[in-house]
A protein has these predicted regions:
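Extended extracellular/luminal ectodomain segments enriched in beta-structured repeat modules
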Residues: 132-139, 206
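Short coil-to-beta strand junction motifs in C2/discoidin
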Residues: 151-171
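Terminal, low-complexity interaction segments
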Residues: 170-240
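Bacterial Sec-dependent N-terminal signal peptides
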Residues: 1-5, 14-39, 238-240
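Generic short beta-strand segments
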Residues: 142-148, 212-217
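Buried hydrophobic residues that stabilize the cores of well-folded domains
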Residues: 34-41, 168-177
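N-terminal targeting leaders for non-cytosolic proteins
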Residues: 26-126, 132
Length: 240
């Protein structure tokens, strides 16, 4: 009887594990790794040929596996490249927060997440599925850029350090279905300093996600802090 009982438990555990594995079989992860992605990294970070020169008119990317795509927003007509906003590919890492808290180092993150490449969002930007399909994006890893984190931590003479109660810098992720999610990069003196995985499954099936940033320190032109962040390891539910 005991042998039968333990066998039953083992079988149940086996079925449970199999179920979990099968559920993960339809997950594709966008990591931005490979030569085709590295070719999209501009040098120098600001004023380079891909994001500001001849390449700015055609700069964009589409992941072959997930169909997720991004690029420059061309919000003002496209003449100013990445300065108008967008999603650029990067591999720059530097933790020199005070020296590199400037737009000339706009594609850097302060710490590696173990991979080579990642994406950097500036200003209001959108990623979408190129095929126009609806898919669930389960999660992604996000991180402040070195520029953003440096200004949040030390200020820069224009924007204040976000080290006090009431200070905040928040990312809002808006799905095309109308659902939204807020993620704090700074809140009441607590500042995100490294990579963080965020669960996006509550947004449901989406065609696109739009990223916007806002904060407590503002002028008549809007938030004073640099609106940059990085993301990586985007988990997407694919069709079974």
């Amino acid at each position: 009887m005991k042998k039968f009982f333990y066998l039953a438990i083992a079988l149940c555990m086996g079925f449970a594990l199999t179920s979990c594995n099968n559920d993960d079989d339809n997950i594709a992860v966008l990591t931005f790794e490979g030569t085709e992605w590295t070719a999209l990294i501009d040098n120098p970070q600001y004023g380079g040929p891909l994001l500001y020169g001849e390449g700015k008119d055609t700069y964009g990317w589409t992941d072959a596996r997930t169909g997720l795509s991004g690029g420059l927003t061309r919000a003002w007509g496209g003449n100013y490249g990445y300065s108008e906003g967008g999603v650029a590919i990067s591999n720059y890492v530097c933790d020199s927060l005070q020296k590199h808290a400037t737009y000339t180092y706009q594609l850097e993150v302060p710490v590696s997440n173990g991979s080579k490449n990642f994406a950097v969002v500036y200003c209001d930007a959108t990623i979408k599925f190129a095929e126009g399909v609806n898919r669930v994006i389960r999660s992604m890893d996000i991180c402040p850029t070195t520029y953003l984190l440096g200004v949040e931590t030390y200020g820069d003479g224009y924007a204040k350090a976000l080290t006090e109660a009431g200070d905040n810098m928040t990312l809002t992720i808006t799905a095309d279905n109308g659902k939204t999610m807020d993620v704090d990069f700074a809140r009441d003196g607590n500042i995100l300093k490294t990579w963080k995985r965020i669960d996006l499954s509550a947004l449901g099936a989406v065609k696109s996600l739009t990223f916007t940033m806002d904060g407590s320190d503002k002028s008549e032109y809007g938030v004073k802090h640099p609106k940059y962040f990085a993301f990586d390891n985007v988990k997407v539910e694919m069709e079974k």
